[in-house]
């Protein structure tokens, strides 16, 4: 519920949850509806929420989890699939690269591609930590950045 409220606040489209994965996209279904900056800000807020809940659970002696977030920007194929039960989904290299950003990241951090960095590098209130080129499974070496609030 908390993550859904965050993406709605930032005009980002929740695509689906699969197991422990939460997929969302900016610029869908209308490319003018939201931007790379919107999804970066949503990602930082989601990370903070999960961090707060983690701290609360650990203090209460309960199991807790961490969250890695990966972002990439680019074209996707979007559509509705299904015959009896319909679902909106997205596909393409951009989706795969975003998944590699997530898997190549670190818990509690928002990892972005060079493409996303180019779109948000001048957004006030953000700071970036270059990671250099990092090997990403099936993608080779990709330039990555961690993003934080300034």
PLM segments and residue spans:
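Alpha-helical scaffold within the catalytic cores of cyclic-nucleotide enzymes
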Residues: 1-12, 28-69, 73, 93-106, ...
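A short pre-motif secondary-structure segment
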Residues: 14-17
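Conserved phosphate-binding and hydrolysis motifs of nucleotide-dependent enzymes
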Residues: 19, 74
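Glycine-centered flexible beta-alpha turn that most often forms the glycine-rich phosphate-binding loop
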Residues: 22
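Cytosolic regulatory/linker segments at or just downstream of nucleotide-handling modules
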Residues: 76-78, 104-150
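Cytochrome P450 core scaffold surrounding the K-helix E-X-X-R motif
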Residues: 80-82
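Short linear X-Pro dipeptides
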Residues: 85-86
């Amino acid at each position: 519920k908390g993550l859904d409220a965050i993406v709605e606040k930032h005009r980002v489209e929740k695509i689906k949850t699969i197991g422990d994965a939460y997929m969302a996209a900016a610029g869908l279904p209308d490319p003018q509806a939201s931007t790379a900056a919107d999804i970066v800000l949503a990602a930082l807020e989601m990370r903070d929420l999960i961090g707060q809940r983690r701290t609360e659970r650990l203090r209460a002696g309960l199991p807790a989890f961490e969250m890695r977030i990966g972002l990439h920007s680019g074209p996707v194929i979007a559509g509705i699939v299904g015959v009896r039960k319909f679902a909106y989904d997205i596909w393409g290299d951009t989706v795969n690269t975003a998944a590699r950003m997530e898997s190549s990241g670190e818990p509690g951090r928002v990892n972005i591609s060079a493409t996303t960095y180019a779109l948000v590098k001048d957004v006030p209130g953000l700071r970036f930590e270059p990671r250099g080129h990092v090997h990403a499974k099936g993608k080779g070496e990709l330039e990555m950045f961690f993003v934080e609030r300034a």
